[in-house]
């Protein structure tokens, strides 16, 4: 009688975390325009257990509750090298040295590149802000800082190996 025993280890789960946002945004992350008076500082983000074959990462922040019929893109950053495992607070400010060399921040729904914090309409209730890190199978998306959120999203989904998200809330 032949008996085989195989132990299969499942890969660790791709995860995203933040020391800055844990359920609720602080005034550090809130936008500083459109009637909001926050500091507009992107949150610290760190991720672990990217799948094998990851060649780059991308970060997005999206508000599906914005009263636009199509949500609101607050941040799109891509072409982050595969060696990147963390972004410090403030990395979303264009020109901030916390953003890895070669990474691109493209246009948001605010009209320009870089992080734009939460600023929902007054009395609209708390909105959810979905922060996602994408592990990608390409080192470069082939897009530039003028790429629209729709084009970035389409391209990310076509190159995605895995994604991990956290959600925080803010209302005024």
Task: Show where each model-derived region lies.
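N-terminus-centered regions that define maturation/targeting leaders and the start
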Residues: 8-172
